[in-house]
Amino acid sequence: MNTVRLGNISIAEFKAFLESMGCVRVDNGNEGHEKWIKPGITRPIIFQTHIDPIPEFIMRNNLRILEISRKEFVEWHIGKKTKTKKS
């Protein structure tokens, strides 16, 4: 059984996920946070860059903004790891 905790997602993994969802990083001049946008979402995705892994409540909030379920994220995460192992 594959169990993925949202609190164990690294910044690099979350950035890869955002890019795969069509999000674009915006330079907001704040080095402690990253801001990502995507057409069609109501708020920007923001997370701290000095806390790795990303806290679970930040992950939940950002997935809610993207209108993506935890299950969809976990399927993406597991699929990505499977592709990496096959390579």
Regions flagged by a language model, labelled:
Residues 1-33, 37-87:
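Basic nucleic-acid-binding interfaces
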